[in-house]
UniProtKB/Swiss-Prot annotation:
Organism of this sequence: Synechococcus sp. (strain ATCC 27144 / PCC 6301 / SAUG 1402/1) (Anacystis nidulans)
Keyword flag Calcium: no
Subunit structure: PSII is composed of 1 copy each of membrane proteins PsbA, PsbB, PsbC, PsbD, PsbE, PsbF, PsbH, PsbI, PsbJ, PsbK, PsbL, PsbM, PsbT, PsbX, PsbY, PsbZ, Psb30/Ycf12, peripheral proteins PsbO, CyanoQ (PsbQ), PsbU, PsbV and a large number of cofactors. It forms dimeric complexes.
Keyword Membrane: yes
GO BP, sorted A to Z: photosynthesis
Localization per record: Cellular thylakoid membrane
Family according to the record: Belongs to the PsbJ family.
Protein name: Photosystem II reaction center protein J
GO cellular component, one term: plasma membrane-derived thylakoid membrane
Gene: psbJ
Function: One of the components of the core complex of photosystem II (PSII). PSII is a light-driven water:plastoquinone oxidoreductase that uses light energy to abstract electrons from H(2)O, generating O(2) and a proton gradient subsequently used for ATP formation. It consists of a core antenna complex that captures photons, and an electron transfer chain that converts photonic excitation into a charge separation.
Membrane topology: Single-pass membrane protein
Alphabetical keyword list: Membrane, Photosynthesis, Photosystem II, Reaction center, Thylakoid, Transmembrane, Transmembrane helix
Top-rank taxon, per record: Bacteria
Length: 39
């Protein structure tokens, strides 16, 4: 399991997890802002 000179898996997982959290946060923020402006 000694890979070549590829990117470490934990870096990929960290970046993917952070990106997913940002997308989910922006989605909820947009929904909350839309709800607040519509009321």
């Amino acid at each position: 399991m000694a890979g070549g000179g590829r990117i470490p898996l934990w870096i990929v997982a960290t970046v993917a997890g952070t990106g997913a959290l940002v997308v989910v946060g922006l989605f909820f923020y947009g929904a909350y802002a839309g709800l607040g402006s519509s009321l």
